[in-house]
Amino acid sequence: TYAEVESFGVGQSATAVYTAPGDGRDLNITIDADGGYVIHMDYRFDWGGNPSTGKPWEDILILNSKPAQTWGPQQHVNNFYFTPGTHVTLGDKSNDGHFAIIADGIQVATYDHRLPVNSVKEVKFSTTAGSGTDIWDLLLLP
């Protein structure tokens, strides 16, 4: 699911309203610009390796940008959990110099702008095939 954007700037937000996946699949929201990702929010139920424990990360929200062909350093929001099958919201609001990352109406993180927010062209919501995630709405708010 995606929405093309004519303009996007400070004070605007992009939010997905959906049913939380019940089988551990990932889902993400990406705000695209010309030739890169302004912000990519990726929820992972079970992912990679945590160097502190040697086990996979669990219930983590990964924030990142991709200015050109290379991803930047990741920012993690640990212990990020949605109850499977529940109706939830995940989004961001562009503030002066950073995004406020908001889940179910609560700010869970901030993420510094790495690309100009006025370069945004598209907002995408996607999930791993077969996850049982139903998108209810993709909201772009002034």
From Swiss-Prot:
Sorted UniProt keywords: Antibiotic, Antimicrobial, Hemagglutinin, Lectin
GO biological process: aggregation of unicellular organisms; defense response to Gram-negative bacterium; defense response to Gram-positive bacterium; defense response to protozoan
SUPFAM superfamilies for this protein: Concanavalin A-like lectins/glucanases (SSF49899)
Thermal behavior of activity: Thermostable at high temperatures.
Pfam entry (one): Gal-bind_lectin
Usage in biotechnology: May have potential use in the development of new treatments against pathogens that cause Leishmaniasis.
Regulation: Cytotoxic activity against L.infantum promastigotes is completely inhibited by D-galactose. Inhibition activity against biofilm formation by S.aureus and S.epidermidis is inhibited by alpha-lactose. Hemagglutination activity is inhibited by alpha-lactose (MIC=100 mM), beta-lactose (MIC=100 mM), lactulose (MIC=100 mM), bovine submaxillary mucin (BSM) (MIC=32 ug/ml), fetuin (MIC=16 ug/ml), porcine stomach mucin (PSM) type 2 (MIC=8 ug/ml) and PSM type 3 (MIC=8 ug/ml).
pH dependence (record): Optimum pH for hemagglutination activity is 9.
Residue ranges constituting the Galectin domain according to the UniProt record: 1-141
Gene Ontology molecular function: galactose binding; protein homodimerization activity
Gene3D superfamilies hit by this protein: 2.60.120.200
Subunit description: Homotetramer.
Function: Galactose-binding lectin. Displays antibacterial and hemagglutinin activity. Inhibits the growth of L.infantum promastigotes by damaging their membrane integrity and inducing cell apoptosis via the production of reactive oxygen species (ROS). Inhibition of L.infantum promastigotes appears to increase with time (MIC=1.2 uM/ml after 24 hours, MIC=0.9 uM/ml after 48 hours and MIC=0.6 uM/ml after 72 hours). Agglutinates Gram-negative and Gram-positive bacteria including E.coli, S.aureus and S.epidermidis, and inhibits biofilm formation by S.aureus and S.epidermidis.
Protein name: Galactose-binding lectin
Organism field: Chondrilla caribensis (Chicken liver sponge)
